[in-house]
Amino acid sequence: MTMATTDVFIISSSPPRQSVSYNVSSPPLPSLDEMIKQKKAPNLRRGGGAASTPLDPTATFTSASALLRRGSSGSLQEFDTARSLATTTKPDENEQKKTAKPKAPRKPAAKKEDGPIEKVAKVPRKTTRNKGEDRAEGFIEGVVEEGKEGVKTIPEKKPRKSRAKKTDNLGGDGEDGGITGAVVPDVSKVAVETKACKPRAKKGDDITGEGVKERAPRKPRAKKTDVEAGSESVAKEKAVRKPRAKKSDGGTTVQPKMAKGRVTKTTNASNPDKVETPKADKVSKHFASNPVVEDLLAEEGSGLSEAVKRRKNWTPPKSNQVLIDYDDSPEAGSSGCNQGFTELLGSFGFSSSEANSIEKRISSGVSSGAAVTRKRKLIEMVHTNIPTTAGTKATKEKAVKKKARTLTDLATSAYTATEDDDTINDTPAPLLQHFPKAASGELTNDGFKKPPKLRSKSPVKGLPKSKKGSAEEPILLSPESALKQVGNQDFVFGTSSQLAREDSPSLLRDLHDAMQASNELDDYDDPFISPPTKIAERAKAVIAAKRNLWSIAARDDHGDLIDIETVDLAHTPVAKPDRIILSQKPSSLWITPAKDEWYDIDEIEENRPPSTQVPVRQMGPIEMAINLELSNSPLQPKNSSKDVSTSSPRKKHTKASIIETTPKKTTTAKMPDYESFTTPQLSREIQKYKFKQIKSRKKMIDLLVQCFESQNRPALGVLQGNIPITSQGSSEVSKVIAGSSTQLEPTISSSQRGRGRPTKDTAASKSKAKSKIKDSVAILETDSNAPLSEFRTPKKSKKGKQVIEDVPDSDHPMTPSPPRRSASQIRKASKALELSPIKNDHDDEAQQAQLFTHIYTAITSAPPSQDLSNPSWHEKILLYDPVVLEDLASWLNTGALGKVGWDGEVAPKELKKWCESKSICCLWKENQGGGARSRY
């Protein structure tokens, strides 16, 4: 037997007693008796059994003090004694005595076991005090076993927080105090123990049933020992913060909970096999063990009990996780192993055998301790022969609201695939039809009874009825017939064709027919559209266009006038100067002419009764000037509507009317005296004429006078332009004009005194009268449709131009409605002017063409400029530079035209016409704002 290698570890046991320390210079020598009792150190051994060199050998000579220190810490004799005790220990439990344990520093939690229950406790890694040895207290030496017969103790580091260990020794006597971690074999039952986080010691009972309180000092975590052969595996137990005492019955064996840590292995001669205990998980204090469940689980077997114990330590899973229940019972295992994938995903019909298996599973779940849900009512299923297919429950479709169909839907409805009624019958019956709800009902093809109520609530609905007007299934056509059908189709574009009504499928056809009918209407029947021939016929009179615009509301579908009530304009407050005021309702023949006929006012006046005829008034200066111009014209009308005999009395009548003008003026309405009116009366009179309020009294009186004169002014007489005046000389006409002008002078001056400054001499009045004549001619030009060249007969005088003084508009009196000429007078004037000579127009055109030729010659014949920055006018035109009209006119008038033989001057306006005729870019020197242009 070889000598085992010994390693010495000093482990502090109980707190050392406080002893008085003496500070001496040299250590005291031991007594003589102690030195005699010490045995001699054995001789050194050779071979494998030789002792190894100690960890702290002395390098110098050994002195008495060194020997004393070695003796105080432990001599070789004590090592040999401990080793001999460890190797010669016999596993005899009856001879062992209880080992005295040091008392814990805190209050102990005792646990008592009764009866034959044997208890195995974890032994802390420490050396008990040997009662037979006489040595000083303070340190306990731990011995590590070596070889097969020794005790092997693994050192462990001290944790940060020390824990108290429970130590229960199963040996009867404690004589083997020097043994560390010894476990008594032949343990048949195991008790469940819990360990607190606080360092507490528990009381344990050995086989004899005697319990002795043990003191567990606060020390580091201890190692767990293995049980000997024949004993059951013992699991580790994790310390719980709050310890609870457990009691077990005599016939049960409960697995103890061991703390986590390293395994301490022991080897004995009688137990060569080693059993390693598994680790246990942490037990939550919220799970309280149910004794009834533990009793049921204990009968099932060790495997089930371990599984249920393990499930207590699980963290509760999340709600979205699928829990799979594994039945560990033999009954559940036998029934679960026969289940296949097809049975799990089978049809919705169940048989009675499957219902019984479900009941067995529920009962087995209750017996195995699973959570029992609330009681549910089992539904008996009818066994069917439908093959097992994974059917899906059809959802109830909501009724689609009827909405307007678009053209796209109508066009593509012929090609959409429609479901037939046969497809519904081929589908399997729904799940609700398997239930035997009612005995009466319809029989389907599959042999199921469909109750009436379930039929109404069934999710499967029939096909909707075909909508009215939907396209039928198309027939495949040949290419030729398809082309013909496409040619017959009518495509309508626009916003009105985006939606088609469901109740009228022929909407597109009707709409297209209506459009074609509207396009086929005769343009000549449309009153708003005039044919080219009619436009050419009516181009001579402006009144034709006015009639077509303003009288269109009173015409029927054929363009004829509607017989409506004629409004009498005699007593209206607002004057109508463009119509002859009628004293009474005229005849229908005069008011409703034919469609293409035109009645002259002169003829109507002759045919009217004498009571309704308008008295002939004196001709004004404008009419006299026009007649004078026409009388001096050499050309005579080719076709005169009346002969000389009929015209002579008219001339006499006109001559007499000029003389009788003065007495007839007194017959007009008398103007009221507005000076005598009060201010409120003047305001009311102004409101009658639709004017705003005026604060000044004088302005109100002047305005009322002007309004009265404009309203009560007699209608203008008919022009006598068509009748040439031969018997009347130019002197007589001039005298008449002079007399009429002298008669008009006081009226003009009196009307101007209200607002403008009074005229100083007759020359100014004559110039104003001439300007008025010119303005009236301009009005005639704008109102008639004759070309402007027929009105303007300017004579270019080479001596110079006579500047005509323009009278500003502010000098003229402001009237509420300026006097207008009647339509018939405008027509007569236009006819008279058309008959005027055209000789002057030809002369002007020839003169203008000659001027343009001289302008062209003057520009092109000018020598080219030597300065590139200042080119000539011809070069500017060729370079497309804009030509300033004022500059070019000044250059031409300063000698350029004289060089080419033209004595006169050219105006910028005439020069602009020449530039436009030659397509030359030209512009004015002044811009639109009135200032000179900075750049061109």
UniProtKB/Swiss-Prot annotation:
PTM annotation, UniProt: Phosphorylated in response to DNA damage.
Region Disordered, annotated ranges: 1-182, 195-291, 303-338, 437-472, 631-671, 734-829
One GO cellular component term noted in the UniProt record for this chain: Slx1-Slx4 complex
InterPro entries per the UniProt record, alphabetical: Slx4_ascomycetes, Structure-sp_endonuc_su_Slx4
Pfam families: Slx4
Function of the molecule: Regulatory subunit of the slx1-slx4 structure-specific endonuclease that resolves DNA secondary structures generated during DNA repair and recombination. Has endonuclease activity towards branched DNA substrates, introducing single-strand cuts in duplex DNA close to junctions with ss-DNA.
Family, per entry: Belongs to the SLX4 family.
Protein name: Structure-specific endonuclease subunit slx4
Phylogenetic classification of the source organism: Eukaryota, Fungi, Dikarya, Ascomycota, Pezizomycotina
